[in-house]
Amino acid sequence: MDLKESPSEGSLQPSSIQIFANTSTLHGIRHIFVYGPLTIRRVLWAVAFVGSLGLLLVESSERVSYYFSYQHVTKVDEVVAQSLVFPAVTLCNLNGFRFSRLTTNDLYHAGELLALLDVNLQIPDPHLADPSVLEALRQKANFKHYKPKQFSMLEFLHRVGHDLKDMMLYCKFKGQECGHQDFTTVFTKYGKCYMFNSGEDGKPLLTTVKGGTGNGLEIMLDIQQDEYLPIWGETEETTFEAGVKVQIHSQSEPPFIQELGFGVAPGFQTFVATQEQRLTYLPPPWGECRSSEMGLDFFPVYSITACRIDCETRYIVENCNCRMVHMPGDAPFCTPEQHKECAEPALGLLAEKDSNYCLCRTPCNLTRYNKELSMVKIPSKTSAKYLEKKFNKSEKYISENILVLDIFFEALNYETIEQKKAYEVAALLGDIGGQMGLFIGASILTILELFDYIYELIKEKLLDLLGKEEDEGSHDENVSTCDTMPNHSETISHTVNVPLQTTLGTLEEIAC
């Protein structure tokens, strides 16, 4: 029996695509690539498959586009804590300089900066001053035969700024006595200020285990309005208010009290209920935050306020070759002349182009404190006489100078506000996988089947191509070498013995 296939029988053999279609797990293609002629059924299956594939591509492209839009969602949660670290509290008297501490040398160097004297070192508007204050100022501003001495802005602010030891009438933390020694001196744009629970100098951070009044910081202050500088003009440093400015902030964040602080007025007891918020932001491309671990030139931990102060410091040093007292670094302090002529105008110019020069992004991890303020009038009619006797001050003085500040946690919990990626890679793969299963019944393994088929197809084509090239090369060598050898042997005499003929055959094999 002849096993060789006839041409008609060979044409009925399935092609490789038909074999793949009938063995693949991809739905629908086995009905398209069937044995036999083209039918309407095959066409309908092809249309259905192509349509499903098109819908899959549309839905998948929409999901991919949504993923690369880098959307985020915000999760808010309340967490109950066993204890909470009490925040840092920075407070500044709105009057930065005590009038009684000014000397003739101070007025000679800084009188114009303080707006007490004009450019000629004269009192500009004496009719606006209180007679007693005017007389004291005239005595201090008498520069006849005066020889000026050296002047230091740092020493000046230390000496002339309000002393917390004199301002503080009492202090309690969680019902326990505290004092001025529990505060750290810091410098801000308001001059000499004080920070409670700074954690500096190796002091442990104070904690609280209860919420509500009586479980935080309570202080009574005398703002000493009698020491306020007289005002007869307006400058950048002029303040018309009386009281203290307070900022509640994290210990890792420097105070920026001139913009982030709130005011506390004399004659009132102010209650500040606060709640800690822990915020987590996403870095680019999902958000715009910057890692808190990426320090700055003058601060080890990044924060918005640290970035602002760092930027202002670099700008002033670059333009004025000095720095203000509240600015970090090792550049020399600005003189009063540099303050008025360069530093203050430079800060004003910087504020105008702040968005272009000082780009301070939100840190990825941030702790802030929400505040709810309420206040009551002090003293009451029944307590006025007692306070007059206790502090040896009149009722009018108490209402104009004394204030009480009570800061406490509203409850022993904190709020977390966290940005999360709205759409991650796992969700993208899940959606695309679901669409693949819905429209074409495919999976990852089906994709691997396609790649495997393409690989085998390419390998077969390459092997066929290489086989043809080898066959052609072998045929050429047989014609050129092996055909010439017999011709060469014909020239040999017939008397050649058999061993020689055997040797010749071996050489022919090697040559071929």
UniProtKB/Swiss-Prot annotation:
| Localization of this protein | Cell membrane
Assembly notes: Can form homotrimers. Heterotrimer; forms functional heterotrimers producing channel with different properties. Forms heterotrimers with ASIC1; while ASIC1 determines current amplitude, ASIC2 influences the properties of the current. Forms heterotrimers with ASIC3; resulting in channels with distinct properties. Interacts with STOM; STOM regulates the gating of ASIC2-containing channels. Interacts with PICK1; promotes ASIC3 phosphorylation by PKC and activation of ASIC2/ASIC3 heterotrimers.
Name it.
Acid-sensing ion channel 2
Which keywords does this Swiss-Prot/TrEMBL entry list?
Answer: Cell membrane, Disulfide bond, Glycoprotein, Ion channel, Ion transport, Membrane, Phosphoprotein, Sodium, Sodium channel, Sodium transport, Transmembrane, Transmembrane helix, Transport
Q: Which residues carry this modification: Phosphoserine?
A: 8, 11
- Residue spans, topological domain Extracellular: 65-424
User: What processes in GO biological process is this protein linked to?
Assistant: cellular response to acidic pH; cellular response to xenobiotic stimulus; detection of mechanical stimulus involved in sensory perception; establishment of localization in cell; negative regulation of apoptotic process; phototransduction; positive regulation of synapse assembly; protein localization to synapse
Glycosylated residue positions: 365, 392
Residue stretches spanning the membrane: 43-64, 425-439
Q: Name the domain of life.
A: Eukaryota
Q: How is its activity regulated?
A: Inhibited by the diuretic drug amiloride. Inhibited by gadolinium ions, the heterotrimer with ASIC3 being more sensitive. Heterotrimer composed of ASIC1 and ASIC2 are inhibited by the snake venom mambalgin-1.
Membrane topology (Cytoplasmic):
1-42, 440-512
Record's family?
Answer: Belongs to the amiloride-sensitive sodium channel (TC 1.A.6) family. ASIC2 subfamily.
Q: What are the recorded GO MF terms, alphabetically?
A: ligand-gated sodium channel activity; monoatomic ion-gated channel activity; pH-gated sodium channel activity; voltage-gated sodium channel activity
Q: How does it sit in the membrane?
A: Multi-pass membrane protein
Q: Which Pfam families match?
A: ASC
Tissue specificity is: Expressed in brain, cerebellum, trigeminal sensory ganglia and also detected in testis.
Q: Where would I look for the motif GAS motif in this sequence?
A: 441-443
SS bond list: 92-193, 289-364, 307-360, 311-358, 320-342, 322-334
GO CC terms in record: dendritic spine; neuronal cell body; plasma membrane; postsynaptic density membrane
What is this enzyme's catalytic activity, as reactions? Na(+)(in) = Na(+)(out); K(+)(in) = K(+)(out); Li(+)(in) = Li(+)(out)
> Its function?
Forms pH-gated trimeric sodium channels that act as postsynaptic excitatory sensors in the nervous system. Upon extracellular acidification, these channels generate rapid, transient inward currents that fully desensitize. Highly selective for sodium, they are permeable to other cations. By forming heterotrimeric channels with ASIC1, could contribute to synaptic plasticity, learning, and memory. Additionally, as acid sensors at nerve terminals, plays a role in mechanosensation and phototransduction.
